[in-house]
Amino acid sequence: MAILNTKIVSGELIGVTSATQLPDIACNRVTLKAQQDNPTFVYIGGAGVTKAGGSTNATTGIQLDASEQITLEISNLNLLYRICDATGDDLTYIAETSAA
């Protein structure tokens, strides 16, 4: 089945240890994948996302181990934030956008 009027955008984001917004890319769907050689975890969530800390809270992001991925239907990557356990925890993305 052909997908018409679609553009694919992909990239890599280096690991950061403070909550950081993803790029401003309008999209319909995005797949985020933790790099295969990441030593620890990447967390994906909303503004103010935090790492898992062993307590109940409303800010801990979805944890991605090395090679794990998540696909979301979302209107813009910039609605998501990431935080990593270490600066070596990189994240890749591939987003489906409407072609202009």
Features from the language model and the residues they span:
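Forkhead-associated
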Residues: I25-D37
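Low-complexity intrinsically disordered segments
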Residues: C84, D90-A100
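N-terminal compositionally biased, intrinsically disordered segments and leader/signal-like regions
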Residues: K7, S18-Q21, L32, K51, ...
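Residue-level detector of conserved, well-ordered beta-strand and adjacent loop positions
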Residues: S10, G45, D65
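Surface-exposed ligand/attachment interfaces on beta-rich extracellular proteins
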Residues: A2-A26
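Beta-sandwich interaction modules
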Residues: G61-L77
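Short, surface-exposed beta-strand/strand-loop-strand elements in extracellular ectodomains
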Residues: Q35-T56, T92-I94
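Noncatalytic modules at the cell exterior or secretory-pathway interfaces
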Residues: N28-V30, L72-D89
